[in-house]
Amino acid sequence: MGEINRRNFLKVSILGAAAAAVASASAVKGMVSPLVADAADIVAPITETSEFPYKVDAKYQRYNSLKNFFEKTFDPEANKTPIKFHYDDVSKITGKKDTGKDLPTLNAERLGIKGRPATHTETSILFHTQHLGAMLTQRHNETGWTGLDEALNAGAWAVEFDYSGFNATGGGPGSVIPLYPINPMTNEIANEPVMVPGLYNWDNIDVESVRQQGQQWKFESKEEASKIVKKATRLLGADLVGIAPYDERWTYSTWGRKIYKPCKMPNGRTKYLPWDLPKMLSGGGVEVFGHAKFEPDWEKYAGFKPKSVIVFVLEEDYEAIRTSPSVISSATVGKSYSNMAEVAYKIAVFLRKLGYYAAPCGNDTGISVPMAVQAGLGEAGRNGLLITQKFGPRHRIAKVYTDLELAPDKPRKFGVREFCRLCKKCADACPAQAISHEKDPKVLQPEDCEVAENPYTEKWHLDSNRCGSFWAYNGSPCSNCVAVCSWNKVETWNHDVARIATQIPLLQDAARKFDEWFGYNGPVNPDERLESGYVQNMVKDFWNNPESIKQ
């Protein structure tokens, strides 16, 4: 069949399948699967571009990491005035009930505060205290928030909290962790910890030893180096990997490390924390200790200037994410954060043993999403997350900076941006109404942004203060915007249907409905997800199914 005839045949086939979907979703699923991947490549081909695919205004300035929602928490100034949303009432924009506007008052009441909303710091520390298990959530007796669920969550986050340096919130340079020394002669563990480097360790002393011994590994080309590094990265635990050139635009303008102080815990042990937990639990209010600030000087803190960035993705569990906003969904996020540090550390050791400098990083040091876009791993979605072709937004990103010159990958476009314009499911599913309902992304101006957003780049507006306020109310991270995303599927043919739908006018209005016809996602409305019993049923399914659903 000629290419033109083949294209027309496949277009007609997919249109026919879509029309039949209204009558019989299950029949269509079987009919579409053999055709859809081929059709998608013709109707909506995947393309590569040599340039960064989104507009960046000449006024753009590098992002200050201490402005993000979680790092701002530890600025004492953020504890002086009530948390502020960019829009006080989004119902005027969306025409729907604003389910997030009362969260600051509800969070204040949870802290025993009456007569005013919670501050930014109070909001975030309320979340952290529940998330660490030091305070019960208000749903602690409900399915999805029980002691069993909380124990799984604690185990999943353990490496991130105990060995990574709590870099999920940001930070840099590198990470530090408090560890309790042990007397090897008596096996006694000290009550007072000492601060040591965490897994995001920038100690490159081994590199000079390798070079001085003449043992630096020489690659035949940048292309060979990239091939080898990608293979090693996958073996060491990454699910997806790409190479980005070092682009200073994405390096934070300020690095910061939370200041830890000793807090005496009820068990008699001293724990180093960036807020006064005993004071809070005794009703004395919320107190944070600020930041140590660092200029982003690579040579001073890591010993080198980066040339390349190895960006990798770790999949999150599909069944666990379906339970959002339960604690089970937090557990798979925590597992990925813990694994990010482990995998990044192993990649760094691999590079150092070859004689190349490396700086392993999680959310710290630089903005991960644009680097992942440059590395060809996906597109930026309406929800502000990287949408990959394989996992959608159901993943976490980490990176390793290096002075090894690698052949970079190119940004790829496979229909995400176009689909996000039409879909808006993540915005509808957000309990805090933190995600923009505007159809098109735009180059945000300062007046379009809340304090944690960086203006002068093309994207959809996100209000992290709203998002964080729901996390505090929920007592656990929320992944609704990931769970309902049409790209969050384990059968990738659905992704191809989404690509096609954006290109055929007859299908565009139905773009977000394909996966709903096929029974995915559950309710989009955040209240209905809980009140219908959907989340509770997904939690029961999670515990009752011994095997995880894999891509």
Swiss-Prot record:
[4Fe-4S] cluster 1 binds at C420, C423, C426, C485. Its cofactor is [4Fe-4S] cluster; corrinoid. Binds 2 [4Fe-4S] clusters. GO terms for cellular component: plasma membrane. Residues 1-39 form the signal peptide. Catalyzes the reductive dechlorination of tetrachloroethene (PCE) to trichloroethene (TCE) and of trichloroethene to cis-1,2-dichloroethene (DCE). This is Tetrachloroethene reductive dehalogenase.
